[in-house]
Structure formats: C-alpha cells, structure tokens
Amino acid sequence: MLARTLVEEGLRRFKKHRNGPLEMIAITGIISDYASIERTEGLKRYAMTDKKVFLRQIIPASWKADAAETGFELLKKRFPKLRLVWTASDVMAGGVIRAAEKMQLNPGKDLIVGGVDWAEQGLQSVQQGKQFASSGGHFLEGGWATVLVYDYLQGKDFAEHGLSWKSRMGLIRSSDWGSKSEMFQRIKPDNINYRKYSRYLHPERDSYDFSLESLKSGEYMVNGN
C-alpha cells in the first residue's frame, strides 16, 4: 500500500523529468524483527511486479532516526537520481527528512518520503507536506485481541470466525490531510470503546468487525464520538 502510493505520487510529480523507472531505496528496522520482515517483504513483492520503480537498495536502521539519517546520506550520494524513500517507521522517515534538509533537498518536492505507524511526528510531517504518507492503525490489534480473549473466557468461542486475523492498515497522505485529519486524530486507544466489539456483551452481532472502517461511523467510539 505505502510503496504503491509513493510510486503513484512519484509518477505524477516527476513525469516531466523522468527517464526510466523511478529510483527508490528502503530503510527498514531490525532485520530479525517480525514487523520489519513483514513490511520489507511486502515492499519487495510490490517492487518485483511494478516496472515503473527500481528498488535500488534496502538497508536496516534498527528503528532509529539517526541511523536512518546516516543511511540516507550515504545512499543519496550513491544514487543521485533517487526520488522515493520507503521507511518501515515514521521515526526513521523523520531521520531521512532531517538528512535531506541538511543536503539542501526539499522533502515533499525533490524527494517523496513515506513511513509507517501514524506516530505523532509522522503525522505532523504529513501535515507539513515533508512526508508524503504514513500507513498505520495496527496499534488497534492489541485491543481487538483482548476482545477475543475476553469473549473466549466468557464462554463465547471465536473459532468459527477464524483463528488468524491480519487487519489492513490505513493510509493518510499529505494531499488528503484536510479531508481525513479529523478522523485520524480521533483514532486513538483512549477514544475507542472496545466493549462494543465484544460478541459476548453484544450477542446481536453475527461477527467481529475488526477494521478501521468500523470507526468511521462513531459506533465504536467512546460516547459515540
């Protein structure tokens, strides 16, 4: 999702100055971390199928901004035509942005940067236009998992609905910040009434709606907000 979004924006932004595929680098977390592996594998699968992008190199930065900053500086010198930077976290995207500005680049114009997590600094950078996109929402999975455990302990087995869930992340771009920012700002753990997801507490529910879309109506929010 994030990689495709960066490529689509790159094709739009640099169409007059492009000769060949867009050059991209990726900065991932700790190479042995499950989240890092999953996100990087998704990126590689996408890059292999889209001939409009050339994934130059993937480097680890251990989820640290300063490591991402140093890594970007080295790779930008190695690949001067670099246009797209995919990072596995908003924290590392912040390091890339800092490095780019030190190199007299203009993130959001000369360079399209994306990250993951909906971290506060990432959303701020998206709002400012320095980071084009942030993918996130996976922090909700902990609450949803707790709902399943609660229901099971109350005698409401969830096996018939599946034993494995992988929720889709949401995406916010700088280009649609104005129309979506209010909803994204509301999607915080303290604003969500997880009790409303429980099929034990709400036997009228036929299934579990563990999705970001479920939050749009306000039904699952505290006080319906």
Which stretches of residues belong to each language-model region?
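Hydrophobic alpha-helical segments within soluble ligand-binding/sensing domains
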Residues: M1-L22, A67-A68, D117-G122, H138-Q154
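Structural recognition of the beta-strand scaffold that forms the well-ordered cores
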Residues: E23-I27, R56-Q57, R83-T87, I112-V116, ...
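Hydrophobic alpha-helical
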Residues: L43, P60-Q124, T146
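Short beta-strand elements at the ligand-binding edges of bilobed clamshell
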Residues: M1-E9, A26-T28, I58, Q128-F139
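Short beta-strand elements in bilobed, periplasmic/extracellular small-molecule ligand-binding domains
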Residues: E23-A26, K44-A65, G108
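Short, solvent-exposed amphipathic alpha-helices that sit
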Residues: L2-L6, Y34-V53, G95-A99
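Hinge/cleft segment of the Venus flytrap/periplasmic-binding protein
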Residues: I27-I31, W144-N225
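Extracytoplasmic "Venus flytrap"
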Residues: T28-E38, D90
